[in-house]
UniProtKB/Swiss-Prot annotation:
Cellular compartments annotated: Plastid, Chloroplast
Biological role stated in the UniProt entry: DNA-dependent RNA polymerase catalyzes the transcription of DNA into RNA using the four ribonucleoside triphosphates as substrates.
SMART domains registered for this protein in UniProt: RPOLA_N
GO molecular function, one term: magnesium ion binding
Keyword flag DNA repair: no
Gene this protein is translated from: rpoC1
Originating organism: Tupiella akineta
Family of the protein in this entry: Belongs to the RNA polymerase beta' chain family. RpoC1 subfamily.
Designated name of the protein: DNA-directed RNA polymerase subunit beta'
Disulfide bonds: none
Swiss-Prot/TrEMBL cofactor(s): Mg(2+); Zn(2+)
Binding site for Mg(2+): 1286, 1288, 1290
Quaternary context: In plastids the minimal PEP RNA polymerase catalytic core is composed of four subunits: alpha, beta, beta', and beta''. When a (nuclear-encoded) sigma factor is associated with the core the holoenzyme is formed, which can initiate transcription.
Amino acid sequence: MSSDLKYSLSSEPPQPQVQSPLLKILKGEVSETTELKKLHSFRLCLSSPKIIKQWAQRTLPNGEIVGSITNAQTVNYKTLKPEKGGLFCERVFGPVKDFYCSCGKQKTKQHPKVCPTCGVQYISSQSRRYKMGYIELVSPVTHIWYLKSSPSYISLLLNLKKKNLEALTYCSENLSLNIKSFQNELLFQNVLHLLKANPFALEKGLKKRKKRFLVNSNWFSFIFDNSYLIKANSGFQLKVKDFPFFLITKNQNLQNFMGVCSQSANGNEQILPEMEKQGKNTFQFSPFLTTVQKHGSSENGSFPELKREKDELELFKLIDSFSSKSPSKKKDFFRSEILTAFYKKYSKFHFSRFRSNKKSFLISLFSSSNNWYFNKNQNIGYFSIFNKNFKIFFSLLNYQILLKTIDKNSLANLLSPLFDNYLNDDSQVLFDDSIKKLNLTKNFRSNEDQELSTLLNSCFFLNKIGAIAQSPFSLAFYTQKSEKFYCFSPSFLNPFEKDSLSGKIFSLKKKKILPSQKMFELKPLTLFCSKKTKRNEVESENPNSNHMLPFIAFSKKQRCEEKADFFKQLRMIELESEKSRSPKDLLFLNKFPFKNEKKLKYNLQKRNKLHTLKNPIGNFKFRKYFSLRLDSSLKRSLLIYQIKNFKNGFEHSDFYSENQTSTNFTKFLVSRELEKSSKFSNSLFSFENFAQLLIFIFDFPAALERQRQSFSLRSYSKSANFRSQTSARGEVGGNFNLEVKQSQNYFLDWKLTNNYRNFYQSSEIQNLNCFFISNFLVKNAIPVSPLSLEQFVFNNETQKNLHLGNEDSRFFANLKKPIKKLGLLKNSFLAETLANAKANAHNLKENRTPVIQDKENESQTFSQLFFDQIDQKEGSSLKSKDLNFTNWNNKKITRFIELLEKTLFLKKPGLVNNYYTISQSLQWPCQKDWARFLNYMTNTADKTDSLIPSYLERGISFDLVLTGAGSIKKLLSLFTPMGKKASIEIVAKQINGTLLKLNRDIKRLEDFFKFEIFFIDDQEIIEKVFMKLVILRSLRSKALRRLKVLRPFKGSHVLPEWMVLSVLPILPPALRPIIPLDSQQVAVSDLNKLYQTVLFRNKRVQRFYNDYYSLNFSEEMRYAQRLLQEAVDALIENGKGDSAAITASNNRPLKSLSDMIKGKKGRFRQNLLGKRVDYSGRSVIVVGPKLRLHECGLPKEMAIELFQPFLIRRLIFKEVATNFISAKKLIKSNPESILDILREVMENRPVLLNRAPTLHRLGIQAFQPKLISGRAILLHPLVCAAFNADFDGDQMAVHIPLSFQACAEAWKLMGSRNNLLSPATGEPIILPSQDMVLGCYYLTTLDRVKIKQKLSQSSFLFPFLISKQGVHENLSTISSNSKGIENWILKKPSQKSEIRTLSSFYEINESERATFESKTNDTSILKLQDKKRRETLTFKRNRLSPVDTKLHLMDLSKNKNQNLFLNRFEKRANCKVWSDSNKYYSNWDQVLQSLNQQLIDLHSPIWLRWNFYFEFVLKKESFLEIRLDKYGNSVYINPNYQSYSNSKLEKIVFYIRTTPGRVLMNKLIFEALNKPSLKKSF
């Protein structure tokens, strides 16, 4: 927790438009020199890491920034001096001694403000009481107050269970987040698990609709338009800064360019002279390249002009001359732009086809496939992209060199459009700035079993045919024009060590992988067919990943045995021969024979498991397939491997030893792939025909297993065999990949060969009689006599010469059948395509032409390039003219490509998610709509679905496994406002919608229990409905609690992610001291030990981040993060919840920050609230019964002392005293004389009364003081409940507000009259108690004893006189026994009973009868029939039966608390009843007058005339008697009231039955309510 202080620079109150300091700090508007003069208010709130740093960071006068604590040491225990950089560092917290540095030097005029030796500022030591420090946590840590409090704020905010959050915080569980790996950071897309936690989130039964988009089979990853070409003298050149890639549309419109390296036809083989002897430093280029003049720095000045030359060996010797002189010249060479110019010239796209003869040869200069050359000092890099787009039979090789002087910091940004990069979060530094720890590419490797069949790695399959079509390394491709196929662009990337210039420019291939050698490469994509086979045909290690494996489609007519043979009987033919005597004999020969004594051996390799390799740079079809098939587990494993691969940097050679076998999946992949890349990454693969492709497929995996075993040849000679070889045996030998042992390259000059091997990275395979492929020198060599498939492996003579056994013959026979069916063995097909290729080879022109030549067919080419078919549904708004791309002009096409470019190559995208139609924060106002959409989007993809093309290049999403507080911080960061509308408001709106739905459902179920439950007999249904109601109510309460937590974040600048700490503040040293004791010991504050624990464990996590265990889901990293979390928890609140407390050596729990703050001994209650201050006093409280509610009695002695300054000022003002001293003497000598002036001073000034402990707001209240005698404070008894005080010796403190603002605030906010209700519950807190309650009860109760006595003494309650045959029976003899009364009444009378009532009543005759129902409220009034004669209404004597009379008497005996004197009953005997003691009063003044005259008692029943409202205890009462006269006047008699009405039933008089005590009580209440002062307060 922190305080956000609001200041104002003036003495006036802050205006509304003044921004809060928190907002200013967030905007960076508050400077360090701002003087904040006055504190108006402060607010407790969350603090951001930036604000916590601002508390602690400060800049010394010498410009040094201090505040960070990284050392866990405190003081030197011998000298007790603070350690530098530790928890008591004088540089951070200030000097121990005033104006002395840690060196012991005192500040003088000559000394600067900061000691130059120790760096301590010369300031006062008081700064150690308020200067703070901070700890930068390596891993985020959750604040324990918001995690383990009740309720848990984070749990309510994220709508997750508290136990799950705790398990995630302490790294015992993982959280899977769907992320996007794109450019330089991970962007979170989906919080599906949060939505699933809501019971209304998912609804079943929703079907996914099929989507139709524009589908194109020729959709490539990169787009090229001629507008991106610039005209040059030598042709068209690509502008790298505008667009890094291009796409070739049709080979018919392509102009073939002359190659760079070519030798004249005469084939001179002389040894070329050395460049050093000539003394020339020139680059030699192809004849078709223009001269480029570049200048760079060197020892002797600038380099000379680059001249045009013909021979490439001269160019190489020039480079070798620079590199062989000295390392400094080598650095100058690469520091200059000469090599950059060389690359730029060769960055054009060369497509040449020429006839190769025996004298022509190619030099594979810079022969590594694709290299990334980077130097630490010069900041220059060369990057080569290898891109293939396969066409019919011959492929067009597209190369692009990306050259740019690069800063190391922008390295990832440069490569970000090409590859999906991964960089860590800011709080988890995985990599340094060095190149070896930067992930440039995304490596997709095979699964654990390295028996990986390159059949899937090197070829793809046709849509319907189902046969092997081509390898990515092959230039031979056979297909029919009607068939569609899938293609892709493989890319290779090899980063080298940054210090390569110190010894060698490019790393040479070695037998062992040195620690400094870091080589990676992107392997080609796997290409698939759209047709599947059954799952039982392919085995996989992971049974759950079968759906993501590609399947090879065979013809339906093939037998299962053929399929099995095809998968199992894969062969690799191993050539084994002796080394030749002279390497010159083997130099650049096209063909060579195998002598008869040559023996060829082969190895049988069984492969029954198929795996895939994946590259993120793929075309549309491949992305569509993989996005639908690849599951999250493989994606996650690939991402884990990628991070570990680049993090470790291949620094340990023994880790990748070839003999080591490890069960670890990641280590196994790294070791295998490293061996594969080191063995074959720079190889030049070539295939002349389909059979050679097959041999390469079979050879490649076995070569991986052999690793560094190399081929060797027996002795060969430059004989006529090379010129006149035409036999099939020679043709077979000419189609093999021959690998020279020890990876040697041979040149005409031995010296040049050695220099070349040291200068460049050597190529391992010399490709003879085939197509040549290098990184940027492209040669498509066509042999003189094309070979057919039948002349190779399917020829009987070939099989005989290869000495194939029965099994091998069967294999080739089975393989021959499907190939023959496809028509691939026809010589005519091969001859036709080769003839076309030869014709194109001679069509070389010097003048370059654009890629798209035909302007008329431009629109058609454009439509073919981007769109395959357009499906238009019925009712669609699309018009036919919009779908016809022939109507598009060039401007429209250019605009489309520009938009597409922006889509594919976004440099700085926002939050990316896979659900492109919803909001970025994945929050919907309506939960039901979101649930339906989520169910629709997360449904299993159908094979008829297609992806949106514009979003294909945005990267691949992964399910990343996270744990610890960092994952919680990522979830909380989703509530960070991203646009105009904050995410908190969206969530609050969603919760409000959920509450409306819950309220509606709860109301429906409650109505069910009110009305419908009576018609249902099934108890089980009722229980289910009841349980559903309970669940809905619990959900509603949870939603309300969550909404209550969300509301404080709305409209404020506080972010929920600040509940996770990344910066930890350190208290000033004075608050956690180290005190030396007498016995040569020291007492250390517990906080220092807790801070030390945090620092130690923070360093542990930092060490793991810098080491191999950089992934937060490794076991070691999890444990380290858990320890750090527990250490911070113990520092904030030790032992909270179920966490184990950190104890001292004596098992005593250490005191944490919370222990120092809370409790009676805490900082607030002990040091602040209990501190003695001026203008305060303390005394015992006693009751003041005559005080008003807002008054308190203040002793005179205390009042004179408290108000003395105001009293002295008033005495001087009234000239009673002349000065301050005389006034004090007057007060001391004659205090009674100044009491009147003191009352004037106290008249409008309140005092604050406080009783400890102050547990809530009402613990301090304001009162009007009243001078009293004595030494105790008088307090109104009703306010004791707010203070929790009683009058048994409690003490209260008195405080005097000084300013007028304080007095006004005391009256308005703290006055006792304004605090009648409890702020916690809203219930009244000032209630009558003790003697007040007793007095009110005595006034309003009935005296049961006196009433009982009157029953025996008078006829007050039963005032009737009974006469029976001259005998009078007194009621007192039977009043105590109900049975006696019953028996007495039920006696049969011998004569009529005479009834006498009040004088205003009439006699009742038997002549007229009336019916009366006493049990209902409806009274039947009998009208008088005889109006002439005044008659009374009589009741029939035998009206009630004996049973009814008995019931009435039983009610009479039960209701003893009611007045019984008016209960009507019918007596069977003739008797007269009269009463003279009932008292009637017209107002309560008469009642009080009779009470004072003692005419009536306090509890005597009386009848009071009343014309206002009144209340009864009973809700319904029946009339006891109704009396009517002949004029229609009526009297309604009730036990509690009497109503007199006229003939029109208008109420004339109304009497209520009460007592004088109740009259007195009500009179006091009415007078109090009608006071003017009380009316004003209301």
